[in-house]
C-alpha cells in the first residue's frame, strides 16, 4: 500500500529549515502523536518547536537535512570580497617588482592579455563549481560528481590555503611592522633601509609578534561569518584601498621626472618581448586572480543562482588590473624621479620605496599611508584563505564557526612559525636547498596552483556535461550563448595549454 508522508516546519527569522540527509528516522503511524514524543532522539539540529504536524509512515522515512547555508547580503559584497582576495600582495608587491625586472610596459601588456584570455576563464570555472555545488570547496566537487575522486581537487585547494596563509601571514606581519615603524620614527631620511628590513625579518620576537597580530585580525573578521565578518570588512577596506591608491598616484605623478616612470610602465620597449617575459606574465596572470587554491570556489558557493557570475568575474578582473596599474603609477614615477632602478626585485616596497618616500615632502606620512593600503590588501586576501579552510571544516554548520576559526587560526600560526624563523635563527635549516618559507612558496605557486587551475579547467570543460555547464553557468546572466561556448572552449583548449607551460616553466624545465 502506497503511503505518503508530509513534514512541515516553521522557520523563524534567523532559523532556517533543517532537513536531515541520509538519516532514516522511525515515524509513528499515529498522526495524533507529536513527533517530539515519537522520536527517542531528535536529530541534532531539529528543534521540537519547529515541527508542526505530519502524516506518517509505519516504516522508516528518509528526510533530507538542509543546513543553514549563509550567503552574501548583496552582489557588491561578493565582488568586493572576491576582488580583495584576488588583489592582495600579488598586485601591490609582486606585480611592480616583476614588471620592473621584465621591461615594464611589455610585461604589463602581456599580463593584461593573458589575464583576459586565460586567467579569467579559469576564475569563472571556479565560480561555476562553487555556485552550482553550493557548498565548500570539497563538497562542491562531491555534489557535482558524487562517488568520484574529484573532491581531492578541493582538498588540495583547502590544504594549499592552510599552508599559504601560514607563510603569507609572515609577510603580513612585516607589513604591519613597517606601519608601526612609520609612526615610531624608525623610517626617516638617512636611515639604512636595507639594514632595517634585515632586522625586521630576522628578529624572532618581532617577526612572530606581528605574525600573531596579523592572524588575530584575520581570525577576528572571519569568525564573524560571511555577511557580518568578511563582507562587512571588505566594504570598508576595499574602497579605502582605492582612495588611498588614487591619492598616492596623483602625488607620485606630480613629481619632477615622473613621466619617465609612466613611459616605463605604458610605453613598450619591444626588446623585452621574448619567451621568458611571456611565461612570467602568464604566471602573474594566474597568481593575480587567486585561482588554483579553491578560494574562489568557496566564495562563489555563497553566491545566489540569480546573480550574474560573468559580470561579477569581469568586474573583479578589471578591479585587479586597475590596482596593478595604480601600483605601477605610484611606484615607478617615484622611483624614476629620484634616480632609483625599477628592477629591484622583492625588496622594492621594503627597501627602495622607503628611500623614495623620504625624498618627498611629508614622506613619512605618505609612506605610512602606502603601507596601510598594503595592509588592507594583505588582509582581504588572508580572509579568503582562512574562510576556504573554515568552510570545509564546519560544512555549513555556522554554530561551529567561532570555535573552528580560533582553533584553525592558531594552528596556522603555529605551522607558520618555521617560515617566520627561516629568515633568522633557522636560516641555515634547508630542505631540498630551500628554507621553509621558500619551500612552501615553491610548493604552492609552482606546483599546487597550476595543478589546481588545470584540474578546474578539465573538470568544467571535459568532465561535466556540456549542456549542464552552459545552463548552470549562464543562470542569472544575460551573456549570449555564443560567449558561453567561447568560454567553455577556452577552458577546453587554450587554458590547459597555457597552464601546462607555466607549470613546466615553474619546475625549471623550460
Predicted regions and their residues:
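Inter-helical loop and helix-membrane interface segments of multi-pass membrane transporters/permeases
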Residues: 69, 97-102, 137-156, 169-227, ...
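Transmembrane helix-boundary motif of multi-pass solute transporters/channels
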Residues: 77-114, 294-300, 310-314, 318-319, ...
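Membrane-water interface regions at transmembrane-helix termini and the short interhelical loops
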Residues: 98-102, 149-164, 198, 213-237, ...
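Membrane-embedded translocation segments of transport machinery
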Residues: 67-72, 231, 235-379, 403-404
Amino acid at each position: 500500500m502506497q503511503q505518503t508522508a508530509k513534514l512541515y516546519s516553521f522557520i523563524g527569522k534567523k532559523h532556517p529549515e533543517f532537513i536531515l540527509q541520509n538519516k532514516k528516522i522511525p515515524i509513528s503511524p499515529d498522526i495524533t502523536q507529536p513527533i517530539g514524543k515519537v522520536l527517542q532522539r531528535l536529530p541534532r539540529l531539529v528543534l521540537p518547536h519547529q515541527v508542526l504536524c505530519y502524516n506518517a509512515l509505519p516504516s522508516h522515512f528518509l528526510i533530507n537535512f538542509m543546513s543553514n547555508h549563509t550567503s552574501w547580503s548583496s552582489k557588491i559584497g561578493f565582488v568586493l570580497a572576491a576582488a580583495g582576495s584576488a588583489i592582495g600582495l600579488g598586485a601591490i608587491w609582486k606585480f611592480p617588482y616583476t614588471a620592473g625586472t621584465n621591461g615594464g610596459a611589455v610585461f604589463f601588456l602581456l599580463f593584461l592579455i593573458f589575464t583576459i584570455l586565460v586567467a579569467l576563464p579559469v576564475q569563472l570555472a571556479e565560480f561555476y563549481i562553487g555556485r552550482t555545488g553550493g557548498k565548500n570547496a570539497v563538497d562542491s566537487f562531491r555534489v557535482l560528481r558524487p562517488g568520484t575522486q574529484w573532491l581531492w581537487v578541493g582538498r588540495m585547494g583547502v590544504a594549499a590555503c592552510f599552508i599559504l596563509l601560514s607563510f603569507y601571514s609572515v609577510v603580513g606581519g612585516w607589513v604591519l611592522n613597517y606601519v608601526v615603524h612609520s609612526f615610531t620614527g624608525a623610517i626617516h631620511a638617512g636611515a639604512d633601509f636595507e639594514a632595517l628590513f634585515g632586522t625586521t625579518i630576522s628578529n624572532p620576537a618581532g617577526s612572530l609578534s606581528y605574525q600573531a597580530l596579523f592572524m588575530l585580525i584575520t581570525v577576528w573578521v572571519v569568525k564573524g561569518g560571511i555577511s557580518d565578518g568578511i563582507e562587512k570588512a571588505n566594504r570598508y577596506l576595499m574602497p579605502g584601498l582605492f582612495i588611498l591608491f588614487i591619492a598616492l598616484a596623483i602625488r607620485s605623478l606630480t613629481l619632477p621626472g615622473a613621466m619617465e616612470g609612466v613611459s616605463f610602465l605604458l610605453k613598450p620597449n619591444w626588446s623585452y618581448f621574448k619567451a621568458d617575459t611571456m611565461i612570467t606574465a602568464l604566471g602573474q596572470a594566474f597568481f593575480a586572480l587567486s585561482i588554483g587554491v579553491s578560494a574562489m570556489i568557496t566564495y562563489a558557493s555563497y553566491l545566489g543562482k540569480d546573480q550574474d557570475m560573468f559580470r561579477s568575474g569581469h568586474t573583479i578582473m578589471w578591479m585587479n588590473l586597475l590596482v596593478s596599474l595604480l601600483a605601477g603609477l605610484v611606484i615607478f614615477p617615484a622611483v624614476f624621479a629620484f634616480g632609483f632602478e625599477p628592477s629591484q626585485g622583492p625588496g622594492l616596497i621594503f627597501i627602495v620605496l622607503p628611500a623614495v618616500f623620504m625624498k618627498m615632502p611629508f614622506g613619512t606620512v605618505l609612506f605610512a599611508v602606502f603601507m596601510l593600503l598594503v595592509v588592507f590588501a594583505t588582509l582581504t586576501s588572508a580572509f579568503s584563505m582562512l574562510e576556504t579552510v573554515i568552510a570545509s571544516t564546519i560544512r555549513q554548520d555556522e554554530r561551529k564557526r567561532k570555535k573552528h576559526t580560533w582553533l584553525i587560526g592558531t594552528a596556522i600560526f603555529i605551522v607558520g612559525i618555521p617560515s617566520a624563523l627561516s629568515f633568522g635563527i633557522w636560516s641555515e635549516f634547508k630542505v631540498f636547498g630551500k628554507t621553509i618559507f621558500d619551500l612552501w612558496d615553491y610548493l604552492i605557486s609552482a606546483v599546487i596552483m597550476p595543478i589546481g587551475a588545470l584540474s578546474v579547467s578539465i573538470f568544467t570543460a571535459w568532465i561535466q556535461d556540456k549542456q549542464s555547464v552552459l545552463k548552470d553557468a549562464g543562470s542569472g546572466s544575460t551573456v549570449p550563448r555564443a560567449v558561453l561556448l567561447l568560454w567553455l572552449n577556452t577552458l577546453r583548449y587554450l587554458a590547459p595549454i597555457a597552464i601546462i607551460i607555466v607549470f613546466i616553466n615553474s619546475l625549471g624545465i623550460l
